Amino acid sequence: MKFLDQAKIYVRSGNGGAGCVSFRREKFIEFGGPDGGDGGRGGDVIVECVEGLNTLIDYRFQQHFRAKTGTHGMGKNRAGANGADVVLKVPVGTQIFEEDEETLIADMTEVGQRIVLLKGGNGGFGNAYFKSSTNQAPRRANPGLEGQEKTIILRLKLIADAGLVGLPNAGKSTFLAAVSAAKPKIADYPFTTLTPGLGVVTIDTRSFVLADIPGLIEGAHEGAGLGDRFLGHLERCSILIHLVDGTAEDVAEAYHIIRGEIEAYGAGLEDKPEILCLNKMDALSEEEREEKLALLAEESGSEVRLLSGVSGEGVKEVLRLAADEIWKTRAMEKAEAATGEEEEGWKP
């Protein structure tokens, strides 16, 4: 299935049905009085988070969604039926924005989560509603209220615990394939990976989700290469695993390019914990290893892990470090949630 992580769609809720002007007409009843029913309510526009979806491809070919209009009221005090709702099904991790692409309406993070995006218009009152002691035969009824409309942006941000970042051809897909059951396309040329991929990693007794995003190049935040839009999928990650190609001529430059793009993107990515790895160690001699390791450690100012997705060198150590950080983040989030509940307290 083709991957699509952003869609722009137009939605409109249903109009309310009109009320009915009607009078009771029955044999031997001279003044039957008004019996016009009310109109039905228009359908709502609802967004629902469902399991089994990982793309917004359904919204590529259909971008207009309109809920049904409520049925008009009828004689004999018959109210019109409510209009059918429109339910937009989206994958977990979808964010809904206003047309300005900045105002967040909702963040769909749990299966089964539903929000009413637009309410349908109310149905109009029939003439039976307007009967009073001073007006026994009203000849008026209300039209139904208009539905609401708006254009929204759906943006999918994959929910992963850890994310792989690096230049094209840094070995990210090979690493993902080595540590999970995922089967990404692997080839010896840049931009083999064109869309993000997910894999479930199990280390010891712990499991977490690892995201592989397409490679970044210098100027990605300005649209170079595939751009930096895929960095949005890392915003929910607890930790970044930064892979630097050990066979590159200048490992320090490769490191600084990625860090520069992450900082230019912002959104808190630059503050996330990072495991820095010198990858493809199986292709280097002992002398080259030591030289590039020392250079990268000096330039980054942090500890560098030696790694090879092909031979498996250093893989388990990196996964354990990532799992430790993920579990630490989960514990902090749990503690914060518990604190929030205590502060709120019981209310009658």
Swiss-Prot record:
Pfam families: GTP1_OBG, MMR_HSR1
PROSITE patterns, A to Z: G_OBG, GTP1_OBG, OBG
EC nos: 3.6.5.-
Annotated GO MF terms: GTP binding; GTPase activity; magnesium ion binding
Enzyme class: hydrolase
Entry GO CC: cytoplasm
Domain of life: Bacteria
Gene3D superfamilies for this protein: GTP1/OBG domain, P-loop containing nucleotide triphosphate hydrolases
Family: Belongs to the TRAFAC class OBG-HflX-like GTPase superfamily. OBG GTPase family.
PANTHER family: DEVELOPMENTALLY REGULATED GTP-BINDING PROTEIN-RELATED, MITOCHONDRIAL RIBOSOME-ASSOCIATED GTPASE 2
Protein name per Swiss-Prot or TrEMBL: GTPase Obg
Species per Swiss-Prot/TrEMBL record: Parvibaculum lavamentivorans (strain DS-1 / DSM 13023 / NCIMB 13966)
